[in-house]
UniProtKB/Swiss-Prot annotation:
This is Putative 2'-deoxynucleoside 5'-phosphate N-hydrolase 1. It catalyses: a pyrimidine 2'-deoxyribonucleoside 5'-phosphate + H2O = a pyrimidine nucleobase + 2-deoxy-D-ribose 5-phosphate; a purine 2'-deoxyribonucleoside 5'-phosphate + H2O = a purine nucleobase + 2-deoxy-D-ribose 5-phosphate. Keywords: Cytoplasm, Glycosidase, Hydrolase, Nucleotide metabolism, Nucleus. The keyword Cytoplasm applies. The lineage of its organism: Eukaryota, Metazoa, Placozoa, Uniplacotomia, Trichoplacea. One of its GO terms (biological process) is positive regulation of cell growth.
Length: 144
């Protein structure tokens, strides 16, 4: 049986305050498939030696080949917004996770994209990330 491919989105250049938390989310997601973007959870220097075009083309190819996209959208990021727009255009199954207790407001372009078919946004507290992911994969994601 083929393993499911999961594309995880999280802020890189928009701010790395949540990088360690992204690593926890990624670790939890591994039970559901292969994570194509595990580097998003690394706390070291961002993708040394890769130019912007290479990063864009590689990440877009991964996004398009993925079965599911999970995005942590609390830290605003132009790149994550772009990835989500491309995911919607490609009719991908998407879960966005947002922490309202961060003091931020989620963009209307993200929350307004909820369609109850393949684009979902879950508000959560940081200690609830695993249960929100588990619920999504149990209810929304079909077996690979």
């Amino acid at each position: 049986m083929a393993k499911r491919s999961i594309y995880f989105c999280g802020s890189i250049r928009g701010g790395r305050n949540d990088a360690q938390f992204y690593a926890k989310i990624i670790q939890h997601l591994k039970q559901y498939g292969d994570i194509l973007t595990e580097h998003v959870g690394h706390c070291g220097p961002e993708e040394e030696g890769l130019d912007d075009k290479t990063i864009h083309d590689r990440d877009l190819a991964w996004l398009l080949q993925s079965d599911v996209i999970v995005a942590e959208v609390t830290q605003p990021s132009l790149g994550v917004g772009y990835e989500l727009g491309r995911a919607i255009a490609a009719d991908k199954l998407v879960l966005c996770l947002f922490r309202p207790d961060s003091g931020r407001r989620l963009s209307g372009m993200i929350r307004g994209a909820i369609n109850s078919v393949n684009f979902f946004v879950e508000d959560y507290h940081q200690d609830e990330y695993a249960s929100k992911i588990d619920q999504f994969f149990t209810v929304r994601v079909t077996r690979p």
